Amino acid sequence: MSFSVLAVVGPTASGKSDLGISIAKAIGNAEIINADAMQLYKGMDIGTAKLGEESRQGIPHHLIDIVAPDQELTAVEYSKLAHDAIRQVLERGNTPILVGGSMFYVAAALDELDFAPTDEVVRERLESESEELGALALHERLKSLDSESAERIPAQNIRRVIRALEVIELTGEKHKSALPEPNYLRPTLQLGIEVDREVLKNRIRQRVEKMWAVGLLEEVQRFLELGVNFSRTAAVAIGYAQARSQLLGELSQQEAIDQTVSLTNRYARRQMSWFRRDTRIRWLDSEANLEKQALEQIRLGR
């Protein structure tokens, strides 16, 4: 299969960003498009492991720092931006490389998706109910209506719980059924990074501890001083709520770090569960040379 779009996916802390840059440098004339939902937000740098300009090694990056943390950017809006970015890279004669682990955003960028309907009145009512009854009550409601979605969506991610309930109410169908069988919008080669679970746990612990060491608290403190009210999407960024709780004296530093590690491990498991269902992905072994494996798959794909 000849492809026009490359993608590098996998769980958090698996090395996607570095591999994306290595591939871009090796094949030449390539540009990276971000598919990490939290790296879209300006100023959310340390907690999202966002690469700085120097670390990007001169490779053009798109869809990073495009919206303020107090603004909402839906998956539908991201889809349009990603499709435009991919088209523009191709028009320049370059290869777009989508890099990220935000599952639905990857699908929104690569696949033909018929997005489920939305209704502002229904959504606002569900949001009011979540404030009145609590996130757990809405998650229990979702479990009674669509147990598979409830298993995939954690109760603390109230934005996705509300979205699933909204789709069910508007369509009468389970949220999962709103996603069709995957079909690439353009010919795509999707590479996934497979990491041993214990190795990944260690990497996640090291990454989180480094975030605290290099200034996550100061980053969150600046947001607090500016009075920034995080949007629903930005508010679910793992690490930011924990750092805020530490600054407010609600958690010790060790408790904040441990909670962030635990939530990140849980998120990584959900990522792998999602990506493993996509039989189109060609998996790379993180214990071997990732760049060499990726370039071999690219050679075969061409």
How would you name each of these model-derived features?
Residues 1-302:
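Phosphate/pyrophosphate-binding catalytic cores of soluble transferases and nucleic-acid-acting enzymes
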